[in-house]
Amino acid sequence: DLLAKELIKVMDGQIENVYYKSETTLPYKSETDKEDGYLIGSANEADFIAIENGLKFKADWIKGQKTGFFVDQRDNRALLEHYAKDKDVLNMFCYTGGFSFYAMRGGAKSVTSVDSSAKAIELTKENVELNFPGDTRHKAEATDAFKFLDDMKDGEYDLIILDPPAFAKHRDVLKRALNGYKKLNAKAFEKIRKGGILFTFSCSQA
């Protein structure tokens, strides 16, 4: 509560709401035992929209994954934009589609967004219309990532993004997680177009 009040003071009126969230984001129980909720302000019926480098993203900080929008990937998204021109881009585990929109703005020939969550895919489609209304370069598919990689043709994409959810939140599943990452990346290397670029990330905490 004290930190929230200081944020309001330092930002001089630029912050209207502060939401505390840890129960559904941490792999362990917070020592404070504080329930998720608003520290300052309250829920607004209007959609929350994050603006990053001129692009807009609908997000759900209450029910969405972690904080609803992964700002830690901001620099990587901006980097990808510079490699996307005239590329066929595949964004795996796309969630709200962040990497996809940077690729589109960077001049990608085509962009495919894949996520196992139908809700995430719907949000991605909404964000496409928010930033690039009527743009036919983008398509989205709700399906398992490993199945999609297995089924796709070799050399179909020359830029692939792998940003999966945590495979290991605890050390007791670390070995299985490492095998999962190896399998995922090996399959991407196998399928990517010759001379292509792979952006790969891991958020596992083990």
Predicted feature locations:
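Non-catalytic substrate-recognition/targeting regions of SAM-dependent transferases
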Residues: 2-69
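Rossmann-like S-adenosyl-L-methionine
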Residues: 42-206
